[in-house]
Amino acid sequence: MRDQFICLALLLCALHSACGLYFHISETERKCFIEEVPDETTVIVNYKVELYDPRSNGFMPSSPGIGMHVEVRDSDDKIILSRVYSSQGRISFTSHTPGEHVICMYSNSTAWFSGAQLRVHLDIQVGEHAIDYANVAQKEKLTELQLRIRQLLDQVEQITKEQNYQRYREERFRHTSESTNSRVLWWSLAQTVVLVCMGFWQMRHLKSFFEAKKLV
């Protein structure tokens, strides 16, 4: 029983994670990240842009003139978000189709900051990790017990979405495998038919050749 509880706790922690990182980009450089998201799932992206200062040999908070263009594409390669944000902000969107969502970011180029080196801090939160439960408790006036129940219900809902997404991936993989096997089978049959036809043609050609030479 204890082992089952530990496994369930690990599963709940691993399902929809929040990842924090930073990366360096230059002017016009584009960075993209792929996030696998079930359908009807909230994704929140927190970011902060810092500008390299050669005098201090470090990164400082960027000026208002520098922002980030953010573009999000769903698994069908449809743009679901595309706009320019300030140098620090919070982006939120909800997936409507399951699969890989591509989040791309690049700086809005200006002549003043042309060629500047930027450092972008990025934090992507998916699923129940994207919910601000402190804000929810304050707005809905929930007790600690009610808030905990709300969190558990959200986790169960995310587990259900994750299971549905895994079944969706398995179905796509099975369909791809069946389609590949079918193409391989038909290609093998086509090769066999071509070889039989070539052999039949060669036999007829040899027979005609021998008859013309009066060897048969």
UniProtKB/Swiss-Prot annotation:
Cytoplasmic side: 204-216
Coiled-coil region(s): 134-164
RNA-binding in keyword set: no
Annotated keywords: Coiled coil, Developmental protein, Endoplasmic reticulum, Membrane, Signal, Transmembrane, Transmembrane helix
GOLD domain mapped to chain residues: 30-126
Subcellular location, principal: endoplasmic reticulum
Ranges per topology, Lumenal: 21-182
Record carries keyword Ion transport: no
Primary role: Eca and bai are essential, though not redundant, for dorsoventral patterning of the embryo. Specifically required during early embryogenesis for the activity of maternal tkv, while the zygotic tkv is not affected. Involved in Golgi organization.
Family: Belongs to the EMP24/GP25L family.
Name by which UniProt lists this protein: Transmembrane emp24 domain-containing protein eca
Taxonomic path: Eukaryota, Metazoa, Ecdysozoa, Arthropoda, Hexapoda
